[in-house]
């Protein structure tokens, strides 16, 4: 389960950030989940809560935001969102994209011109979007 590895990295990053800034406590973390990554938020939240026990982040509040997947065609410049085409995916394709997001290029084409030459402009990956530490202004 890669959610546990992600959780470990998130908690370690927040703690390191607090320590680098001379703070004794992490109060909150905002975690961005890319839609294309399709991370199980419930498992990730559970893992973060377990990993932060006994640390300066133990009482930190968690906030999750979902970043919609967006694409831009390199051929015609068209921009579209995953939600616009996702209903055409079967469960196998959804699972393939979950584990290896790069395969999205094998299953998606620009809805405007049909090109498979596009870039993922948003909604990929998982990252710590914000950290609130002791002493931050409200």
UniProtKB/Swiss-Prot annotation:
Ni(2+) binds at residue 2. It comes from the Archaea. GO terms for molecular function: nickel cation binding; zinc ion binding. Zn(2+) binds at residues 73, 76, 110, 113. One of its GO terms (biological process) is protein modification process. The keyword Metal-binding applies. InterPro entries: HypA/HybF. Keywords: Metal-binding, Nickel, Zinc. Pfam families: HypA. Belongs to the HypA/HybF family. Involved in the maturation of [NiFe] hydrogenases. Required for nickel insertion into the metal center of the hydrogenase. PANTHER family: HYDROGENASE MATURATION FACTOR HYPA. This is Hydrogenase maturation factor HypA. It comes from Thermococcus sibiricus (strain DSM 12597 / MM 739). The lineage of its organism: Archaea, Methanobacteriati, Methanobacteriota, Thermococci, Thermococcales.
